[in-house]
C-alpha cells in the first residue's frame, strides 16, 4: 500500500488516508451562515475521496471576519445551519469534517477578493473597526485598535464559545487559526506585537493568548473531537516569527494535548519574501515533524500524487493538504489512487464512471 493511502489518526479521529482539504474561504455566507454555495461546495469536496475536509475560517465574532461574507460561529443560528450542512453531507460521504475557527484581527474588514480585496474603512458600508495586539496597520489598511487586557480575555472566551458550537454542530475536528497574519498570529510575532504587558515581549508573553485558548478549549471539548492549530512557521522576515519559535510553540501545544499542527507560512507582512516553488513549505513542516510526536500536516504547492506520496513516505509530514489543486481538479484523490495503483472509496452513484484502464480503481 502507498503511504498516501494508508489510514492514520489525529487524536481519537481515524482517517482513511493522508489527504486533507485545508480551509479555503469562499466569501459567500449570509450573516455568517452557510448558503447553497457552501452546501454544494463542501458536498463536492467530501465526495472527492479525501479523508478530512476542513471548513473555511469561521469567525468567532462579527468583527473577526476577513470580509462581510465570511462564515461565522458566533451565534447558535449559525451552529444550527452548520449542523444541517454536515448532516446532509454525511448522508453521502464518510469523510471526516472539521472547521477552522478564526479572528482576522488587523486584516479584517476587507472587500471580497474578486472586488479588489482592499481594506474597508470603519465608516464605510461593510466595514468595521479592526483590532490587534498593537496599533500597527497591515500595509495600507486602517490602523487597528490595540486590545485591552479585558478585550483579550473576551477574545479568549469567544474562541472557546465558537469551539463549543463547533462541537454541538457535529464537527469531528476543530482547527484554531493562528497563521497568515490574523489575530492569533499577530500576537505571536514580534513584528506585530509590541505590547509591554503579559501578552507581549518575550516568547512566553507572545504565545500566552494562543496557549491559554488551547488549554481551556481542550479541557471543555470532548476528547473524541480532535483539536489542532494552524501556524505560519515563519513570517519570512528577519525580525519576525521564525521556525525555532514555531518548534518551541509546537512543543508547548503538544504538552497541552494538541492533536495536530498544520504548517503554513507568511501572511503577516507586506514585506515578506516568500520563495514560492513546489514543496516550498514542506521543509518547515519537516523541521517541526522532527521535533514533535504530534501529526503534522504539510501544505502549499503540493499538486502531484507522486509528490504527495514522497512527502509522507519520507516522513517529512504525516498528512498533505491539497487546496487550490483540488478546487481545480475535484477528483484529485481519484487520480492519485490511479497513479499509485491504489483503490479508493467512492459514492455508489459514481462507481460506473471508472475508465476501462482503471476498472479496479473503485472499492
PLM-predicted stretches and their roles:
Residues 1-363:
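Flavin-dependent oxidoreductase catalytic cores
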Amino acid at each position: 500500500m502507498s503511504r498516501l493511502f494508508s489510514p492514520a489518526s489525529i487524536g481519537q479521529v481515524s482517517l482513511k488516508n493522508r489527504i486533507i482539504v485545508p480551509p479555503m474561504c469562499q466569501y459567500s455566507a449570509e450573516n455568517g451562515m452557510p448558503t447553497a454555495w457552501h452546501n454544494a461546495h463542501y458536498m463536492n469536496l467530501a465526495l472527492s475521496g479525501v479523508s478530512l475536509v476542513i471548513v473555511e475560517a469561521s469567525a468567532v465574532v462579527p468583527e473577526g471576519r476577513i470580509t462581510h461574507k465570511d462564515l461565522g460561529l458566533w451565534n447558535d443560528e449559525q451552529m444550527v445551519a452548520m449542523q444541517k450542512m454536515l448532516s446532509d453531507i454525511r448522508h453521502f460521504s464518510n469523510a471526516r469534517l472539521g472547521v477552522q475557527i478564526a479572528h482576522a484581527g488587523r486584516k479584517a474588514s476587507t472587500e471580497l477578493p474578486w472586488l479588489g480585496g482592499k481594506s474597508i474603512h470603519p465608516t464605510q458600508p461593510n466595514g468595521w473597526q479592526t483590532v490587534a495586539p498593537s496599533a500597527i496597520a497591515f500595509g495600507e489598511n486602517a490602523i487597528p485598535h490595540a486590545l485591552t487586557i479585558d478585550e483579550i480575555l473576551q477574545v479568549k472566551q469567544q474562541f472557546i464559545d465558537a469551539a463549543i458550537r463547533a462541537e454541538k454542530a457535529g464537527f469531528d475536528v476543530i482547527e484554531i487559526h493562528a497563521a497568515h497574519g490574523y489575530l492569533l498570529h499577530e500576537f505571536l510575532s514580534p513584528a506585530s506585537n509590541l505590547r509591554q504587558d503579559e501578552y507581549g515581549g518575550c516568547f512566553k508573553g507572545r504565545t500566552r493568548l494562543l496557549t491559554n485558548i488551547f488549554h481551556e478549549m481542550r479541557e471543555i471539548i470532548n476528547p473524541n473531537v480532535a483539536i489542532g492549530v494552524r501556524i505560519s512557521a515563519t513570517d519570512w522576515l528577519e525580525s519576525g516569527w521564525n521556525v525555532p519559535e514555531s518548534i518551541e510553540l509546537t512543543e508547548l501545544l503538544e504538552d497541552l494535548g494538541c492533536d495536530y499542527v498544520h504548517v503554513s507560512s507568511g501572511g503577516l507582512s507586506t514585506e515578506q519574501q516568500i520563495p514560492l516553488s513546489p514543496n516550498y513549505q514542506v521543509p518547515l513542516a519537516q523541521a517541526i515533524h522532527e521535533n514533535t510526536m504530534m501529526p503534522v500536516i504539510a501544505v502549499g504547492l503540493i499538486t502531484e500524487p507522486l509528490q504527495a506520496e514522497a512527502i509522507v513516505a519520507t516522513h517529512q509530514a504525516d498528512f498533505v493538504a491539497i487546496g487550490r489543486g483540488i478546487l481545480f481538479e475535484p477528483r484529485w484523490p481519484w487520480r492519485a489512487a490511479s497513479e499509485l495503483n491504489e483503490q479508493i472509496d467512492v459514492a455508489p452513484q459514481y462507481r460506473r464512471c471508472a475508465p476501462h484502464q482503471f476498472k479496479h480503481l473503485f472499492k
